[in-house]
Amino acid sequence: MEQQNNARIYIVDDDSLSAKVMSSLLSDSGHIVESTTDAASAFDKILDARPDCIICEMMMPEVDGLNLCKRIRENPDLAGMRFIMVSAKAYEFDQKRAFEFGADGYIRKPLNTETFANLVNRILDDHIDMKFWGVRGTLPVPGDQTLKYGGNTSCVTLEFPREQFFIFDGGSGIKNLGDSLMAEKRSRIRARIFISHPHWDHINAIPFFTPLYVPGNEFEILGANQGDTTMRELISAQMDGVYFPITLSEFGSRVYFRDLEEESLEIDGIGVETKLLSHPGKCLGYRINYNGRSICYITDNEMFKETSEFYFPHYEKKLADFCRDSDVLITDTTYTDEEYETKVGWGHSCISKVVQLADVANVKTLYLFHHDPDQSDADIDNKHELAAKMLMERNSSVKLETPKEGDLFKI
């Protein structure tokens, strides 16, 4: 969605200094801002101004933020107006209550002047921030041949306007994610960590994710069990004293675990679908559905060529249906077709099969992901060119991206 650089914003806050700071930050970001410190007259002023967005303090005399939000949501003439609550109340109950009354966002005080305008913009645009923290497969690859795309293994994040925070996989990229969150001085982080499967390149950096050790944070780790081994046991096993000196008991944050099957569920108000994938062991792909947009995270996954004795058309049809019409398909593209000839049965796909899946499923944009550790930046550039050529030969409408470590996309 297009960013609203010139949105008309009305601030209601009985703290004149706070209102002044917010006005300055948003004006510098290109918005047109008005404000009032008089909560009692705010509704009438909003009716006259008809702004695109209201930013309102929750606790004010005479008329509090919840009541003002309720009045606005009950007025059909103000339909479509964004409402962002700001408050020093750090309680989860109050944030939930604000959303129940119709708020589109909840920003805690004291305001972070470095991130405030970006948070408001995300809510205005209603976009999802999708960021890649690691795009490699198998094991990290440092060195001068991996500077462009990065050498870290699988980790992708989705951040939503209402602060829902989804993390996909705990490869070495999650270490950089944790460092970034700590540098931003984020507090009371609530996030879901979705694990595709427990192979090393998808879980082995979880013990190095610093926010797990910070009291006040809360994480749920979700993924498929492996027979009689639960997700909790899978994560704790690699932190056993034999392999690693720190155990789960050292986590300072609240950490929960949930075993998933192939199913559909709702998490934090967002639709989540899971799909069992073609890979050794129990491996899940994820489809995230949010306000008319869908993001599919499909790694690791092997689609056999039609000439293979292992070719399974029923599986590929079900996978295409799972990804159908999605805005984003992030998927295992480990090998070129030539490389794949000697890697059949290793659990990963080649370019032609990935392109075929994206085209048949009519996805909007294909993201090449999970690159082989032996591939240099130049090799990945070549994979991108090969995929682009194949899409062109199919006369496909699918767009192509080969994300680099640190790339941010707004969906």
Residue ranges and their predicted role:
Residues 304-399:
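Cap/insert and terminal regions of metallo-dependent hydrolase folds
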Residues 20-28:
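Charged docking surfaces used in two-component/phosphorelay signaling
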Residues 49-55:
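Active-site beta3 strand of CheY-like receiver
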Residues 19, 61, 79, 91, ...:
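The feature encodes the CheY-like receiver
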Residues 125-299, 304-309, 317-320, 378-411:
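Binuclear metal-dependent hydrolase catalytic cores
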